[in-house]
């Protein structure tokens, strides 16, 4: 009798994201008799012929796969429906596509529903927002099961004290000056466009006085960033400001900063959504065009920072959530009442 297999599929260039990695680690420990397969090939390139071949390969793999776990639109529509024993699970990590769909339907609600995820048998939306989005704007087969009221694996993990302690030790190893301080994380994602003349990309924060901002932020805060534009600005700071500022690249991952942050400033829907379970302050900082920014500006305007200078409007002596931040946290994460990894383990233990 052949072994049961579980396939992790990611075809949008994201590889095994943190949610998939956490689920994989748990399943490998809990189900040692199961074989695991991976299809992580990006299917969108600049060469149409390659795209066609990659799509054919993805369709063949997913058709033959016994069980699939994905976290984005990686399961093709043009494959047969799953059999009664097969599981196709979508972990709905809050990537930008969710906000793109929401804004399109908000502006034009009469559009036909999308079939993007129609071959999934199980969906873990991770938040009330995503659950409503998927029910409102997507088509599903009759037998689909929504695993509601359960946070995503990374959100659950962010609250686990053992992991928080491990990451804290790592932070204090690299930045001993952060010990005992509150952590302000400025985590920005996106690729700056390359200038046509071949010169270096411009610093998008060039016009801002970082010293003024650092002086404004109370001394009981330590500012952490992954952003090189901010690091370049930090060269203008006197040495004593190193007690308040650190650059985490090649030291600590962006995801790990979710475990430690007391306030998050980001342009990433994924990080904002994952962090919302902590019920701590979140702000969106405009840095490269993001549909998530349009969403925040329209529906949570007090959380929107149009530029770096607007940090000077924040009250760093108060970490109580504003009414809009409370609403955001309620909308973008379920309460941590059930371990998502254990739920997924039960789903595949048949």
Question: What is the role of each PLM region?
Answer:
Residues 1-66, 75-76, 193:
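N-terminal pre-catalytic "stem/leader" segment of glycosyltransferase-like enzymes
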Residues 17-26, 147-236:
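Conserved catalytic-core segment of nucleotide-activated headgroup transferases in glycan assembly
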Residues 21, 46-113:
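Extended catalytic core of nucleotide-activated donor transferases of GT-like folds
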Residues 51-65, 224-273:
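Donor nucleotide-activated moiety binding/catalytic core segment of transferases
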Residues 73-94, 135, 251-293:
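A donor-sugar binding/catalytic signature common to diverse glycosyltransferases
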Residues 98-99, 105, 112-195, 324-327:
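A nucleotide-sugar donor-handling region in carbohydrate enzymes
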Residues 238-241, 270-336:
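Catalytic binding pocket for nucleotide-activated donors in carbohydrate/polymer assembly enzymes
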Residues 335-350:
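C-terminal alpha-helical cap of glycosyltransferases
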């Amino acid at each position: 009798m052949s072994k049961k297999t579980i396939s992790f599929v990611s075809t949008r260039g994201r590889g095994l994201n943190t949610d998939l990695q956490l689920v994989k680690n748990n399943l490998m420990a809990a189900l040692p008799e199961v074989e695991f397969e991976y299809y992580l090939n990006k299917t969108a390139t600049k060469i149409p012929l390659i795209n066609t071949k990659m799509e054919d390969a993805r369709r063949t793999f997913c058709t033959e796969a016994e069980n699939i776990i994905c976290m984005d639109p990686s399961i093709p529509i043009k494959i047969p429906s799953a059999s009664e024993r097969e599981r196709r699970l979508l972990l709905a990590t809050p990537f930008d596509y969710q906000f793109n769909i929401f804004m399109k339907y908000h502006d034009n609600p009469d559009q036909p529903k999308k079939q993007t995820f129609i071959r999934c048998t199980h969906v873990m939306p991770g938040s009330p927002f995503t659950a409503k989005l998927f029910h409102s704007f997507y088509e599903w087969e009759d037998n689909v099961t929504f695993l509601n009221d359960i946070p995503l694996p990374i959100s659950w993990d962010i609250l686990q004290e053992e992991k928080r302690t491990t990451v804290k030790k790592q932070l204090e190893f690299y930045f001993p000056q952060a010990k005992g301080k509150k952590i302000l994380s400025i985590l920005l994602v996106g690729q700056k466009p390359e200038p046509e003349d071949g010169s270096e990309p411009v610093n998008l924060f060039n016009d801002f006085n970082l010293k003024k901002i650092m002086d404004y932020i109370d001394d009981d805060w330590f500012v952490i960033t992954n952003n090189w534009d901010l690091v370049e600005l930090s060269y203008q700071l006197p040495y004593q400001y190193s007690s308040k500022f650190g650059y985490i690249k090649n030291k600590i991952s962006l995801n790990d900063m979710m475990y430690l942050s007391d306030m998050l400033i980001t342009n990433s829907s994924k990080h904002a959504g994952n962090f919302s379970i902590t019920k701590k302050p979140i702000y969106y900082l405009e840095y490269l065009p993001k549909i998530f920014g349009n969403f925040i500006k329209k529906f949570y305007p007090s959380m929107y920072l149009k530029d770096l200078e607007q940090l000077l409007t924040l009250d760093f002596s108060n970490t109580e959530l504003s009414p809009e931040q409370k609403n955001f946290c309620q909308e973008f994460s379920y309460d941590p009442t059930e371990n998502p990894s254990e739920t997924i383990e039960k789903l595949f233990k048949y």
